[in-house]
Swiss-Prot record:
Pfam families noted in UniProt: IF3_C, IF3_N
Protein name per its UniProtKB record: Translation initiation factor IF-3
Location of the protein in the cell: Cytoplasm
Recorded family membership: Belongs to the IF-3 family.
Annotated keywords: Cytoplasm, Initiation factor, Protein biosynthesis
Keyword rRNA-binding: no
NCBIfam families, A to Z: infC
Top-level taxonomy: Bacteria, Pseudomonadati, Pseudomonadota, Gammaproteobacteria, Lysobacterales
Residue segments, region Disordered: 1-22
GO function terms (MF aspect): ribosome binding; translation initiation factor activity
Assembly and interaction partners: Monomer.
Main localization (coarse): cytoplasm
Any one Gene Ontology cellular component term annotated for this protein: cytosol
UniProt function note: IF-3 binds to the 30S ribosomal subunit and shifts the equilibrium between 70S ribosomes and their 50S and 30S subunits in favor of the free subunits, thus enhancing the availability of 30S subunits on which protein synthesis initiation begins.
């Protein structure tokens, strides 16, 4: 018994019935060359598919009568899988990039981190800004708030602040996302 004829329940079997799984008495048949054959009984369509050494696959079960095509089911499944993989590749996963600052971060370092932040946002990633306080810096949290405000001002209108600066232990955290393009 060929593997394709097993009664294993897979998502593909649920979507496209083939050969003996088709239960309707009459079907509209499309030949293996893509030409319309016409409306045939299920048995005639199965005989025609078997004659060509191919499968009868139900393409549109909602149509009246259902549309079936004579094709190689294994190849059809492979093509569907390939299309699904291509669609999956095209979707970009949004990553969260983290940049760490100190309230006393030097101007050169600040500019480099700002440039990296812009690049991450242009690529569509979110940025987590982390301003870390050490020792007595905790008593000067206003420096951290000023740093967060400066970052927000320097990035301009191209961003959305997802979460305002908030204190978590010894660090101030702020989330920035790119503005959606319309």
């Amino acid at each position: 018994m060929p593997l394709g004829d097993c009664n294993i329940s897979t998502p593909d079997n649920k979507q496209n019935r083939k050969n003996q799984e088709i239960r309707v008495p009459r079907v509209r048949v499309i030949g293996s060359d893509g030409e319309m054959v016409g409306v045939l009984s299920r048995d005639e369509a199965l005989a025609k598919a078997e004659e060509e050494g191919l499968d009868l696959v139900e393409i549109q079960p909602q149509a009246d009568p259902p549309v079936c095509k004579i094709m190689d089911f294994g190849k059809f499944k492979f093509e569907q899988q390939k299309k699904a993989n291509e669609a999956k590749k095209k979707t970009k996963q949004v990553e969260i990039k983290e940049l760490k600052f100190r309230p006393v971060t030097d101007e050169g370092d600040y500019q480099i981190k700002l440039r990296n932040m812009r690049r991450f946002l242009e690529e569509g990633d979110k940025v987590k800004v982390n301003i870390r306080f050490r020792g007595r810096e905790m008593s000067h949290q206003e420096l951290g708030r000023e740093m967060a405000a400066r970052i927000e001002a320097d990035l301009g209108e191209d961003i959305v602040i997802e979460s305002r600066p908030r204190l978590e232990g010894r660090q101030m955290v702020m989330m920035i996302a790119p503005k959606k393009k319309i």
